[in-house]
Every structure is written in C-alpha cells, then in structure tokens.
C-alpha cells in the first residue's frame, strides 16, 4: 500500500522534527535521507513555506513532489519584505513590476486553473490587493484593468502558456 505524507516545510531547511519526522517514522523510511532530498529540491525557495508530498510505496521507495509556495510568499520574496500590510488600502508596503508579476505567474503555472498567462497574472495582482502591494505604482485593481485593456501586451507578446 502506498502512503502519502503532505506537509508545508521551510524551503531548504526542513528537519526531521514535526511535521515530517512523526509522519515518516511509522513508514520505516530513512528520515534523514528524505529530509536531505526535500532540502535539496526546495533550496530555491529559501525562506518560504513550500508544500511537499512524500510518497512511500510498499518497498519503501520514496518519491518527493514539491509544489510552489503560496503566491503571497512569492510576492514577498520578490519584494524582499517580511509581511504584507496590516492596513491594505491605506498602507503600501511595496511596489511590484509587471515583469515580476509575470515571473510569479509563470512559477504558479502548474498550480492554477487559469488557461493563460494574462489570467494568472490577474490572480497574482489580486493577491497584491490585501497585501498592500501596488503594481507599477498603482493599485493592483487598476493594474488588472490596464492588463485587460492591453497596456502590457508588448511584454506578453509571443508568450506561450
């Protein structure tokens, strides 16, 4: 029987303690080895919480699937901030460029239901709203409208999804 352990771990810094150790221990796998593999696969997400799925089959073979961090975490990493605004709408904590929004949208490609880059970019911009992050110096909602109106089409030219 295959067992699956899902956890949210710090990128590149998972450890054998909770939540991984107690969940993997009863499965009889080498926890240290699994944690090392997870850290290797998540090191690019240093400082962010990363969803991982550890799949252990009957023969104790381990497969590790790494998801992408939450959109808010990716935005904070791009901006170099620790947290969003506690007073969104009146307090701005950062400004993100449209190219950074596109970069995050590409990273989230596998995890979203959108069918194209533009729609995923709008989702990323939507996450900026409650965080107090502006896009290209204006409120994120206004940037979403500008995206719909084609203002950033030159950036997206030739982009395949």
Swiss-Prot record:
SUPFAM superfamilies assigned to the protein according to its UniProt record, in alphabetical order: Ribosomal L11/L12e N-terminal domain, Ribosomal protein L11, C-terminal domain
Gene3D superfamilies per UniProt: Ribosomal protein L11, C-terminal domain (1.10.10.250), Ribosomal protein L11/L12, N-terminal domain (3.30.1550.10)
GO molecular function: large ribosomal subunit rRNA binding; structural constituent of ribosome
Keywords: Ribonucleoprotein, Ribosomal protein, RNA-binding, rRNA-binding
Record text on subunit structure and interactions: Part of the ribosomal stalk of the 50S ribosomal subunit. Interacts with L10 and the large rRNA to form the base of the stalk. L10 forms an elongated spine to which L12 dimers bind in a sequential fashion forming a multimeric L10(L12)X complex.
Family that this chain belongs to: Belongs to the universal ribosomal protein uL11 family.
Role: Forms part of the ribosomal stalk which helps the ribosome interact with GTP-bound translation factors.
Descriptive protein name: Large ribosomal subunit protein uL11
Species per Swiss-Prot/TrEMBL record: Methanosarcina barkeri (strain Fusaro / DSM 804)
């Amino acid at each position: 029987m295959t067992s699956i352990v899902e956890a949210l771990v710090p990128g590149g810094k998972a450890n054998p303690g909770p939540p991984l150790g107690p969940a993997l221990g009863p499965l009889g796998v080498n926890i240290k080895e699994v944690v090392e593999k997870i850290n290797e696969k998540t090191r690019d997400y240093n400082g962010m919480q990363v969803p991982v799925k550890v799949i252990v089959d009957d023969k104790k073979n381990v497969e590790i699937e790494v998801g992408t961090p939450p959109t808010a975490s990716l935005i904070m990493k791009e901006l170099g901030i620790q947290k969003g605004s506690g007073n969104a709408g009146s307090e701005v904590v950062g400004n993100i460029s449209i190219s950074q929004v596109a970069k995050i949208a590409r990273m989230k490609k596998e995890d979203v239901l959108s069918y194209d880059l533009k729609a995923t970019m709008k989702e990323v911009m939507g996450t900026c709203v409650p965080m107090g992050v502006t896009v290209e110096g204006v409120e994120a909602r206004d940037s979403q409208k500008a995206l719909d109106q084609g203002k950033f089409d030159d950036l997206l030219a030739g982009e395949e999804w």
